Amino acid sequence: MAIILGADAHGNALKELIKSFLQEEGYDIIDVTDINSDFIDNTLAVAKAINEAEGRLGIMVDAYGAGPFMVATKLKGMVAAEVSDERSAYMTRGHNNARMITIGAEIVGPELAKNIVKGFVTGPYDGGRHQIRVDMLNKMA
């Protein structure tokens, strides 16, 4: 499974830490960061790369996570979550089949970021009753 990473200038240092962590865990990383672009362009690049192949997940890091979340949720078929704790990262995969998370580097420290990312990439989608919600989300955008 490939993990797509992106960041703006405010999130790049934390993104690099996340990148190293995921590589150590054995994940294939595709880093689409353009440090000279803002969060909107970088979020769109992450989403585009996610949609290019089945099974990809994405992580976008900026200062607070809110902006990239708003961008991602405007895109057809993109279920995204802004997360700042491990449990939410894990559960958004299990219940919402989220394909992207957004993280705020000014909110989340290095160790918490690693735990968030681990929960997100290892969390299985539960399907079943949750698929109804996912279908509803996919119809909205």
Curated annotation (Swiss-Prot):
The pathway this protein participates in, as annotated, is: Carbohydrate metabolism; D-galactose 6-phosphate degradation; D-tagatose 6-phosphate from D-galactose 6-phosphate: step 1/1
Q: Which reaction does it catalyse?
A: aldehydo-D-galactose 6-phosphate = keto-D-tagatose 6-phosphate
Q: Which GO terms describe its molecular function?
A: galactose-6-phosphate isomerase activity; ribose-5-phosphate isomerase activity
In the record, biological process GO terms are: D-allose catabolic process; galactose catabolic process; lactose catabolic process via tagatose-6-phosphate; pentose-phosphate shunt, non-oxidative branch
Any idea which UniProt keywords this protein has? Isomerase, Lactose metabolism
Q: Report the EC number(s), separated by commas if there are several.
A: 5.3.1.26
Pfam families named among the record's database cross-references: LacAB_rpiB
> What protein family is recorded?
Belongs to the LacAB/RpiB family.
Please describe the quaternary structure of this protein: Heteromultimeric protein consisting of LacA and LacB.
Protein name per the record: Galactose-6-phosphate isomerase subunit LacA 1
Protein source organism: Streptococcus pyogenes serotype M6 (strain ATCC BAA-946 / MGAS10394)
